[in-house]
Amino acid sequence: MMMNSPLDYDVLLEIMSYCPATEMAKFRLLSKECNKRSYEMSFINRHLHRTNSFLGYIFYYKDNKWFRNHSCFVSGVDEKDKNRINLAFLPPLCNVSIEACDTHHGILLCVDVVFKGRQKIPDYIVCKPATKQYRIIPNPKTRFGTVATGLMVISSNPFRYKIIRVSDTWARVGRDGVYNLRESLFE
């Protein structure tokens, strides 16, 4: 016969500190105490260190003077030795912007708009800043202007993802009064 014993939260938090962020939600559902202690800064710092993760915000903005795209990472923890997100490991491009991200896997979708002749042709790059890995993906057909871009990671090992691109068809409102958009799905 099994005896009911209280959970040892210190042991449980130690195990959780090695888990990826995608598994944290499952542990937080175990109890209110486990959920509360997993948001304490001592646990967050230990988890970030052990999983080589970042905690913070990515701000995306456009420079009105030079019409360039910029992104800035603001750390959510006050650590001096923690590296900030840096996209300098990407191939030398002129105007890289972060279009979408998957926060569970730490994956970013970056776009660099390059003028080839008189046309703007985007280069799409899927990257993981924590490991400095990137993959330049083939350009989709960009007949229409991009309205929105989304990224969904299917699996991290092997690395599989889907990118959805919503574009404007120039036919703003159809005969039925509906706003027309096109979507492209590529992997």
Curated annotation (Swiss-Prot):
InterPro entries: F-box-like_dom_sf, F-box_dom, SCF_F-box_component. Residues 2-49 form the F-box domain. SUPFAM superfamilies: F-box domain (SSF81383). It holds the Pfam family F-box. It comes from the Eukaryota. This is F-box protein At5g41720. It comes from Arabidopsis thaliana (Mouse-ear cress).
